[in-house]
UniProtKB/Swiss-Prot annotation:
It is found in: Cytoplasm. The lineage of its organism: Eukaryota, Fungi, Dikarya, Ascomycota, Pezizomycotina. Keywords: Cytoplasm, Initiation factor, Protein biosynthesis. Residues 385-426 are annotated as: Disordered. It comes from Chaetomium globosum (strain ATCC 6205 / CBS 148.51 / DSM 1962 / NBRC 6347 / NRRL 1970) (Soil fungus). Residues 179-350 form the PCI domain. This is Eukaryotic translation initiation factor 3 subunit M.
């Protein structure tokens, strides 16, 4: 989307409309409308013939479309004419195959930017722009503007349904551009527009379809390990009734381990393959999540290689490789002790934080409290020892001073006494 711009036109609506009509070769047809001041009828005829602008010389394209956009925005009902105008811009610019995308993108941006910021019609134009961007695979051009999306929705008072339409369009556009992170993020935003208290809405076909898509994206994405934003959505929770197997699989990825996943596969033999899910990717992800759970549940923060190999169901010689992978995934921080054959946990990520995790946290707090209590005892003993030593040194100093004659008593003052002065001394 281009930066905001102005277009400069000079003339009355009738003069400019007649000029445009001549340009699209319907001058005679439009004259009677303009003579009777039937401006809407004249504009309708011009819009219907405006597809010919896609074949005019490249150097005339921007000026012609700017004039057409100006005429549309002078209408009593611009929304009536904007869809066909934007639709024409999404068709090939035959006069400029090399620069057609840029020419059309600039024209669409002009429409958007010339509308008042709070004009709800901007929503429809933005939807058309998103579809145009998707058609040409240029998501990176749209992405920076999407940061304003929620603010625009508030400004335009956009309905939940329309918000969902645009979020889904953006999600699909991002997916086709290979931006899986944005695709998932906007899909979650789309699902969140379903009314939380409206049971009919969250169990609707559309809600269940989008929720199922989000679950598949979440469990399949190699770098997504947090599913809490997904699980709290009512329509996703409703999958427990409409798609119970998917719901069960999601629960495994949220808080269970590799053994549970393998049991799931045995229970639903062939289901993963039938649903076209990649078992190798899912299994790898479950191993990483299982490692994270193991690290979080180990009280002494030291995990023997043997425990890791058992939990991940891997040969012992692969333990170090998987440890490196889980650290790279930022699920765990720590270091390997090859000499002791243990992994020393510095920090771990809790996959969920429920009653079990609170108990583990309480255990660790008690352990830390015990350590702190021991430190306090040690510090107090050290402080008492220091004070005792200081007192002994003070007593020793006083004893030495007394022995050196500084304390008074017999022989304590060896200074020669002065003889009283008399007259004979003179």
């Amino acid at each position: 989307m281009a930066a905001p711009q102005l277009i400069f036109v000079d003339g009355t609506f009738a003069e400019l409309a007649q000029e445009m009509a001549e340009y699209v070769q319907i001058g005679e047809q439009v004259k009677p409308y303009l003579a009777k001041e039937q401006n809407e009828e004249a504009l309708q005829a011009i819009i219907e013939a405006s597809h010919v602008l896609n074949s005019i010389p490249e150097k005339e394209f921007t000026g012609a479309y700017n004039l057409l956009i100006h005429l549309v925005l002078q209408s009593k009902d611009p929304l009536k004419y904007l869809p066909p105008l934007c639709g024409n811009l999404q068709k090939p610019i035959t006069s400029s195959p090399a620069h057609g995308f840029t020419l059309a993108a600039n024209a669409l941006s002009t429409v958007f930017n010339l509308l008042e910021p709070d004009n709800p019609t901007r929503f429809n134009v933005l939807l058309q722009i998103t579809r145009f961007i998707r058609q040409h695979g240029q998501y990176d051009l749209l992405k920076p503007r999407l940061e304003n999306l929620e603010g625009w929705f508030n400004l335009w008072n956009t309905s939940d349904e329309d918000q969902r339409r645009l979020y889904v369009e953006v999600s699909d556009t991002a997916a086709e551009a290979g931006d899986d992170e944005d695709s998932y993020r906007y899909l979650i935003k789309a699902i969140a527009t379903f009314g939380r208290e409206d049971q009919d809405e969250i169990t609707s076909e559309e809600a269940q379809k989008l929720s199922l898509k989000a679950v598949r994206l979440a469990i399949s994405h190699p770098a997504r390990f947090d599913f809490q934003d997904l699980r709290i959505l009512p329509s996703v929770q409703a999958l427990g009734d409409s798609h119970p197997v998917y719901s069960q699989l999601l629960d495994i990825f949220i808080e269970q381990d590799l053994e549970d996943y393998n049991d799931f596969k045995d229970e639903h033999e062939g289901w993963v393959e039938k649903e076209k899910l990649d078992n190798e990717k899912l299994q790898r992800k479950m191993r990483l999540l299982t490692f994270a759970s193991l690290a979080a549940s180990t009280p002494n923060r030291e995990i023997p290689y043997a425990n890791i190999a058992k939990a991940l169901q891997i040969p012992s010689e692969e333990v170090e490789m998987w440890t490196i992978d889980v650290v790279r995934a930022k699920l765990v921080e720590g270091r390997l002790s090859q000499q002791q054959k243990v992994f020393l946990v510095h920090r771990t990520t809790y996959r969920v934080f429920g009653e079990k995790q609170w108990r583990e946290l309480a255990t660790r707090v008690d352990q830390y409290k015990s350590i702190v209590d021991q430190l306090l005892v040690f510090l107090r003993k050290g402080q008492a020892d220091v004070e005792g030593q200081r007192e002994r040194e003070q007593q020793e100093l006083e004893r030495k001073l007394a022995g050196a004659g500084m304390g008074g008593g017999p022989g304590g003052d060896r200074r020669r006494q002065q003889k009283p002065r008399t007259d004979e001394d003179d």
